[in-house]
Regions:
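Conserved NTP-donor binding/palm subdomain of two-metal-ion nucleotidyltransferases/polymerases, i.e.
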Residues: 2-132, 138-370
């Protein structure tokens, strides 16, 4: 198949798999340019708050807050307000750790940019969401100094190439993910840092200061993260959050510089990943991006190959990783029983990650995806 045909086929699969029918319906009307009482009533008529996933309830609570003119039934209004209150209190402990770390880094001094959900908390303080940790980025030359300072404060690191993920003490409770670059799996990730820091603005966070990315960088990071979520088969909640964030930033387009987003994608080698993520968003929000944003990428054979790679990672690699569970081999030998099936899955993953393009397509065909 040609590039565009493959792209369309994969987008159809993703649209049906990633979000449930109820979630697609909710996004389509909740993020529409205008929301009517009739569309809300029609949705609520077949909606059961007891059966609905948490992210959908949160999106409805946002809708209630942004559209005070809409009338919600008495049976659901207290629950929707309660979700916002729950998220606000859930974040208190996390942000207490964040502000303590921010103050420490500012005293060194080490500049840091807050990313993703932490940044949205600053952009939209009245719209809390559940967060497991807060992502921050520092200059590469400051990374080890920042990591040592945070570790000296009693936080325990899980060390990766692009970040150290700090938990609270010896617990598994997340606190801060310290990045030297934002992972994109292109080998060019660090090229984003200079512009990201230069365009960010300083904001006060309790007893410390941090840098907040500009709107354009937030949109770029959201699209890259969406691509990762699609290929990694993460929960629909992360995808819903991306739609909410993009609607917030793209609904306020005055002075929005699309060239920054394009330049970020070019520098980091993520043009196709960003275009695919934008194309996925456009299946539900058709007017989110300007007509020329995707350019000719979607018609290229390269885009088709990237779509099949996304599908391979999502349907073949990610489920096997989830089945393996424990990634640290030494820890696995101490804790996993029986060990032989675990070893077999690790060997299988090793070879599946190293197959060529034709073999990957053949595996997808055998599974019925293409």
């Amino acid at each position: 198949m040609e590039g565009r045909a493959v792209v369309n086929q994969v987008l159809t699969i993703l649209t049906q798999e990633v979000l449930a029918a109820e979630e697609r319906q909710l996004l389509s009307f909740a993020l529409a340019p205008s929301v009517s009482q009739e569309s809300l009533d029609a949705f609520l008529e077949g909606w059961d708050i007891e059966e609905s996933p948490f992210p959908s309830i949160l999106l409805l609570s946002y809708l209630m807050k942004t559209h005070p003119d809409l009338s919600f039934p008495d049976s659901v209004m207290p629950r929707l307000k309660g979700v916002l209150t729950y998220c606000r209190f859930q974040n208190l402990k996390l942000f207490a750790h964040f502000t303590k770390i921010a103050a420490k880094l500012a005293s060194l001094p080490i500049a840091m940019v807050v990313l993703k959900g932490g940044a949205m908390k600053i952009y939209r303080p009245d719209f809390p969401r559940w967060m497991g940790d807060i992502d921050i980025l520092v200059h590469e030359q400051d990374f080890h100094r920042a990591a040592e300072a945070i570790e000296a404060m009693g936080y325990s690191p899980l060390k990766c190439a692009h970040s150290w993920d700090f938990s609270i003490g010896e617990t598994q409770e997340g606190a801060i993910d310290l990045h030297r670059y934002f992972q994109m799996n292109t080998g060019k990730e660090s090229s984003l840092n200079e512009g990201l820091f230069a365009r960010a603005r300083e904001v006060n966070v309790a007893s410390g200061k941090c840098l907040l990315p500009c709107r354009e960088d937030m949109v770029f990071i959201s699209l890259v993260n969406l691509y990762k979520n699609l290929s990694g088969k993460t929960s629909s909640g992360s995808v819903l959050n991306t739609f909410i964030d993009l609607d917030y930033f793209l609904g306020r387009r005055d002075g929005f510089d699309w060239d920054i987003v394009r330049d970020n994608a070019r520098k980091t080698g993520t043009e196709i990943q960003v275009s695919l993520a934008a194309a996925f968003v456009s299946t539900l929000l058709p007017h989110a991006f300007p007509e020329d944003f995707l350019g000719g990428w979607m018609d290229s054979d390269l885009a088709g190959r990237q779509c099949l790679e996304l599908l391979y990672q999502r349907e073949i690699i990610s489920p096997l990783r989830a089945e393996i569970g424990v990634t640290n081999v030494i820890k696995a030998f101490k804790t996993v029983r029986p060990i032989l099936p675990y070893i077999g899955r690790r060997i299988r993953l090793f070879f599946l990650k190293r197959t060529g393009y034709r073999t990957r397509v053949a595996i997808l065909k055998k599974k019925g995806y293409v």
